[in-house]
Each structure stands twice: as structure tokens, then as C-alpha cells.
Amino acid sequence: MSFVVIIPARYASTRLPGKPLVDINGKPMIVHVLERARESGAERIIVATDHEDVARAVEAAGGEVCMTRADHQSGTERLAEVVEKCAFSDDTVIVNVQGDEPMIPATIIRQVADNLAQRQVGMATLAVPIHNAEEAFNPNAVKVVLDAEGYALYFSRATIPWDRDRFAEGLETVGDNFLRHLGIYGYRAGFIRRYVNWQASPLEHIEMLEQLRVLWYGEKIHVAVAQEVPGTGVDTPEDLERVRAEMR
């Protein structure tokens, strides 16, 4: 099964300026992500960026670049520009790998592509079980609840589902019903074309979760449990130091 990986790599970052190019053990971060994507068996890998310095780093590592506008409001909008520039057919399977995930396992890139290809749905993603209360109550850990067939009912920064009886006894433990959403998505190219024409939903603005737009318009997102748990992503200088230590 063939699929394409697109890696959005926006240069500007409030907490970590020039984030795609930060050095991790002798290589720019975006090159580490590119290497993980190559291990997935993708037919084609494209880094979508708005900055020439990022493009040069990727091309120096033998990667393909698509220059995109700097004014996109989301990573999916950047994907849509690449889809149009590359004229992908509507049934092309595209995996969106975040440019700040240098430790992402290649197995889960492949998994989300396979997951999408096996279903008549426009979008698929992954999640991992939550086993501790700190993560369950952390608004930066996005939770997802599923229906009986593994389709998302809702994504939230809140603690869902709310375990009434257990939480009434204290917050020290959580049960086995919590899933943390991972920020990796598989799409069919035709779905991306439709998505970017939808208006943002009220729920999306409240939670600041772009995927809620899909549910708002009555579409389905399939969610599988990831075969591997990805390593630390890089959002802050502290994350960067942690990743450097873990990747030594």
C-alpha cells in the first residue's frame, strides 16, 4: 500500500524560534523527522515549509521540499496547499507527520496509513492509553473517547470520560478508559480538499483543537491504539534539552 508523508515545518515559533532548525546531536530537528519518515516505507516524503533556510537544510539531506505560504492558520491548510501544488489524486493516502517529532517511531507512521487504507473514511489517527492521573487531568494532553467501532465521539482537553465514582474517592488513580490523542493524521487527499472549505466550528475555537471541525460537520475519524508510544515532542527549550539527552 503506497502513501505519501507530508511534514509541515513552520519556521516561526513563539516558544522556540527557528524550531525546525534547532540542533539535535549534530543535525537539524527537521532532518531527524525526515529520517524517521524514510524508515516508514512511504512512497514519497515532502517537507512543507515557508522558510528558505529550512528548505536548504532538507535539500542538503536529500529531501524534497514544497515551499508554502507563511500565512496559513493551521498545519492542515499547509497540507492542502501541497496537495494542490502536487496535484495528488483524491484517493491518495497522505500522512501528516509533525515537524517537531524527531523521535516518532516509523511503525506508527505506517500504522496510521494502513489504518486509513483499510476503511472507507476520510481521516484516521492514533491514541495511547493513559495510566496516571497527572496526564488525565493535564489540559495539554488531549483526550479522545471512541464508539464501539473505534471512531471518535469527541476530543477534549478536559478529562473525558469523567469517572464519577472513582474521582469522587480522590484523584490519585485512573481506570483503563482513558486515551491520549497523538498528533499524527492520515487523510485521503480529497478529504483535505473538502476540509479546508469548511468554516471553523465553535467547538474548535473553544478547545483549540482543529480536528473537532471534522466531527462538527458529521464526518468520522477512525482512532487506533498506537503500536508504539512516541518519544518526546519539542515545543519548548526544556523539551529540546530532554530530547537531546534521550537521543544521545
UniProtKB/Swiss-Prot annotation:
GO terms for cellular component: cytosol. InterPro entries: Cytidylyl_trans, KdsB, Nucleotide-diphossugar_trans. This is 3-deoxy-manno-octulosonate cytidylyltransferase. It is an enzyme of class 2 (transferase). SUPFAM superfamilies: Nucleotide-diphospho-sugar transferases (SSF53448). Its EC number is 2.7.7.38. It catalyses: 3-deoxy-alpha-D-manno-oct-2-ulosonate + CTP = CMP-3-deoxy-beta-D-manno-octulosonate + diphosphate. Keywords: Cytoplasm, Lipopolysaccharide biosynthesis, Nucleotidyltransferase, Transferase. Gene3D superfamilies: Spore Coat Polysaccharide Biosynthesis Protein SpsA, Chain A. Activates KDO (a required 8-carbon sugar) for incorporation into bacterial lipopolysaccharide in Gram-negative bacteria. PANTHER family: 3-DEOXY-MANNO-OCTULOSONATE CYTIDYLYLTRANSFERASE, 3-DEOXY-MANNO-OCTULOSONATE CYTIDYLYLTRANSFERASE, MITOCHONDRIAL. The gene is kdsB. GO terms for biological process: CMP-keto-3-deoxy-D-manno-octulosonic acid biosynthetic process; lipopolysaccharide biosynthetic process. Its main location: cytoplasm. Pathway: Nucleotide-sugar biosynthesis; CMP-3-deoxy-D-manno-octulosonate biosynthesis; CMP-3-deoxy-D-manno-octulosonate from 3-deoxy-D-manno-octulosonate and CTP: step 1/1; Bacterial outer membrane biogenesis; lipopolysaccharide biosynthesis. GO terms for molecular function: 3-deoxy-manno-octulosonate cytidylyltransferase activity. Belongs to the KdsB family. It comes from the Bacteria. Pfam families: CTP_transf_3. It is found in: Cytoplasm. It comes from Shigella boydii serotype 18 (strain CDC 3083-94 / BS512).
